[in-house]
Amino acid sequence: MTYNALSTSSAAGALGFIDFMTSPERYRHWRLGFEGEVAELIMQVDENAGLFEGYQLKLNSYDLGVDIELADALQRLRFEHPEVKVVVLKSGRDKMFCAGANIRMLAGATHAHKVNFCKFTNETRNGIEDSSENSGQKFLCAVRGRGGLCAYRLRA
C-alpha cells in the first residue's frame, strides 16, 4: 500500500506528491536508538533536505518532511517496540534544540499547505500524548540549548 498526498505547496513545483512512507534507514532528520527500556530520539535536521526547494532548515527548524519522519518514529516506538517505557527526545546539535517551524517554508506555502502542515504537526504531537496515556511510554525532552518560541511543543 502506498500513501501519497497531492502537494498543496506553491514550492512543490514538479514534485506533485508528498510521500508519507518512510523508515528509520531513510530518515534524514532523526536518529532512533535503543538501550533496554529506554529509547533515544535525536533531532538533527539536515539543513539541505527540505521537502521543497527555496529554503534551508537552519537551527533544527522543521517542515513537513521532518514531521513525517517524527510521526513514523513515534508509530514504530509504540507498535514495534512495546518494551520501551521511556523515550528521551534531544537535539543532535550543540546549544540548539529547535528553532521551530521553518519561516521560509511557511512563506512559500499556500494557505492550504499551511493548514495541513499545522494539522499534521498537531496530530503528531497528539500521538505522543496518546502513547503516554495508552501505551505506557513516557516522553522526556532533554533540552541543552535554545528552543525558539515556536519550537516543538512536546506536551508529553
Locations of regions flagged by a protein language model:
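Surface-exposed beta-strand edges and their flanking turn/coil or helix-capping segments
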Residues: 53-56, 102, 154-155
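Histidine (H) residue identity feature
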Residues: 29, 81, 111-113, 151, ...
